[in-house]
């Protein structure tokens, strides 16, 4: 009985290591493609993605919460995106210190270009996984992340 438990435990540890290795590989691949093909970064892509999903804009604190990073990290990225004309700062009435960040039309078009290629790269990487298998993997991984939501 103990050997089965030990074996199951070791299989789960190896599974976790494989998930981690795969995630790191995909992230590195995406970072390189964005840098080489578009001279941009994955964090900038992530910020633009969050803003694309919020057409009325987001406060820095909201953006930090969505991306799970510090306000300081977000502020530097937003500053550069504003300089490039991809993001605009919108004043919040009644709060002189806070503002919303929103994609400009130029930024939205640029993000759509990035997103189209991003999806293509992911599809290339995962091409050996059927749609049904991808759904099953997603379900299994969701069962793990839902445990974190209980806290």
Region roles according to the model:
Residues 15, 43-44, 106, 133:
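N-terminal positioning helix adjacent to the helix-turn-helix/winged-helix DNA-binding module
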Residues 2-3, 79-138:
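Charged, amphipathic alpha-helical coiled-coil/dimerization segments
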């Amino acid at each position: 009985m103990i050997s089965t438990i030990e074996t199951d435990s070791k299989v789960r540890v190896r599974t976790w290591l494989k998930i981690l290795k795969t995630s790191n590989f995909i992230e590195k691949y995406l970072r390189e493609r964005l840098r080489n093909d578009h001279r941009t970064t994955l964090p900038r892509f992530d910020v633009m993605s969050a803003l694309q999903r919020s057409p009325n804009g987001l406060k820095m604190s909201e953006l930090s919460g969505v991306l799970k990073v510090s306000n300081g990290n977000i502020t530097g990225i937003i500053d550069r995106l504003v300089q490039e004309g991809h993001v605009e700062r919108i004043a919040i009435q009644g709060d002189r210190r806070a503002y919303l960040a929103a994609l400009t039309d130029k930024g939205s078009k640029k993000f759509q270009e990035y997103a189209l290629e991003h999806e293509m790269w992911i599809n290339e990487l995962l091409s050996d996984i059927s749609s049904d298998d991808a759904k099953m993997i997603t379900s299994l991984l969701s069962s793990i992340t839902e445990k974190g939501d209980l806290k």
